[in-house]
Amino acid sequence: MNYVTFNQDYSCLAVGTAKGFRIYHTEPFSKIFTGDNENVTIIEMLFSTSLVAIKQSPRHIVIQNTKRGTVICELTFPSAVLAVRLNRKRFAVLLEEEIYLYDIQNMGLLYTISTSANPNAICSLSASSDNCYLAYPLPKPREETGDKRPAHAPPLSPYVAPTSGEVLIFDAKSLKAVNVIEAHRAPLSCIALNNDGTLLATASETGTIIRVFSVPDGQKLYQFRRGTYPSSIFSLSFNMSSTLLCVSSNSDTIHIFRLGGPVTGLPESPQSPGDKDKWRRSRSFDSENGSPPAGISPGSEMADVPAEKSKSSGTFGSMIRRSSQMVGKGVAGVVGGYLPQAVTEMWEPARDFAFIKLPKGGMGVTPRSGPVKSVVAMSSSSPQVMVVTSDGGFYIYSIDMETGGEGVLVKQYSVLESDDSLEPPPINYVSYRT
């Protein structure tokens, strides 16, 4: 297997292999389509329609109608395609340092966004056509050093790798950046928008704290503790009603957090009449990343101390232009120009409501030799969690919505077939909104 993903409403599961791709219904589990395209390394569906996006070679994407067996269009890019995201309005293609945004109705190119290097394709496009938001790591502008480069040297990227976990919220309908959310002190490892495009879940490379923000205003609503020790987050997934958030990592435990309790977030700074057109930034830093100041408990968090406000904060109209370069420069100008008041939060992040322990042996006879990669989703019709693992297992667990606790394995299938291999190339296990 090369790739596996759920569609936007989790009703289908797509698997890419060296021999082609397969599409399954998740409830009840059954194979509904097989494609014979060779070496499919990315496949993404548009809900339960016959439209799929397929990557077979590094720089090439094919949009295909599986029902008619026809190719709708083919796209070639200047560098390797790392991920594809789509909804009923927009089609996004992620390269390492660019995002190409298309109108899915006619596949016309609408916008090109320059980004910091994003080798893990951290990006989420909401499934909603109304709240059509694209979230990705905030580009970090390269600082001018004054050093002269040789004339024959290739031009440097205007951005460098992020050193903190800030998320840029981009309106894919109006083609404007609308907010920056300071989610974590450490760089991001995974983000996910909910089905309605109103919530954003984030995790940093530390992997111990999961946060949920409102979109597009960026207010922090929930903070959850996944664990005490650092972990690599593989998948974040809201259920369809946005009352639960499921998290998988490089441990054998999958955590389910409940949303809908007391809303906890940062109070908003007082706004002047002109502040409505400025970037609003929600600051929420990982307490486990670095030593907390005196008087702050290990489980608490503290926002940065406010700095002197820059004179050149600007407005959305003056900062945001059609050019993606101007988006980056505008963001950079406002980052240093608008800081909220200092706030110290003394509340402990909430623990999981329920959890799942994956089988130690997986789908094989012998126990796994290392951590299993997984992608998770939640059923839209029952309190069940669906998990696909890197050894080809498809597991369905029942969750007690009253008491929580450990989920019960109720069904188990395999998405492997006799000619599939679990050997390299490495498998990309991503949820649709990651």
From Swiss-Prot:
Location of the region described as Disordered in the Swiss-Prot/TrEMBL record: 262-318
GO biological process: autophagy; protein transport
Cross-referenced Pfam families: PROPPIN
Source taxon at top rank: Eukaryota
Keyword tags: Autophagy, Endosome, Membrane, Protein transport, Repeat, Transport, Vacuole, WD repeat
WD repeats: 1-34, 183-223, 228-267, 367-407
Main location as per UniProt: membrane
Positions of short motif L/FRRG motif: 224-228
Annotated Basic and acidic residues bias: 274-286
Transmembrane stretches, start-end: none
Membrane topology: Peripheral membrane protein
InterPro entries on file: PROPPIN, WD40/YVTN_repeat-like_dom_sf, WD40_repeat_dom_sf, WD40_rpt
Keyword Transport in record: yes
Compartmental location: Preautophagosomal structure membrane; Vacuole membrane; Endosome membrane
Function (record text): The PI(3,5)P2 regulatory complex regulates both the synthesis and turnover of phosphatidylinositol 3,5-bisphosphate (PtdIns(3,5)P2). Necessary for proper vacuole morphology. Plays an important role in osmotically-induced vacuole fragmentation. Required for cytoplasm to vacuole transport (Cvt) vesicle formation, pexophagy and starvation-induced autophagy. Involved in correct atg9 trafficking to the pre-autophagosomal structure. Might also be involved in premeiotic DNA replication.
Entry note about domains: The N-terminus might form a beta-propeller domain involved in specific binding to phosphatidylinositol 3,5-bisphosphate (PIP2), leading to the association of the protein to the membrane.
Subunit structure: Component of the PI(3,5)P2 regulatory complex.
Family designation: Belongs to the WD repeat PROPPIN family.
Protein name: Autophagy-related protein 18
Source organism (scientific name): Botryotinia fuckeliana (strain B05.10)
Gene transcribed to yield this protein: atg18
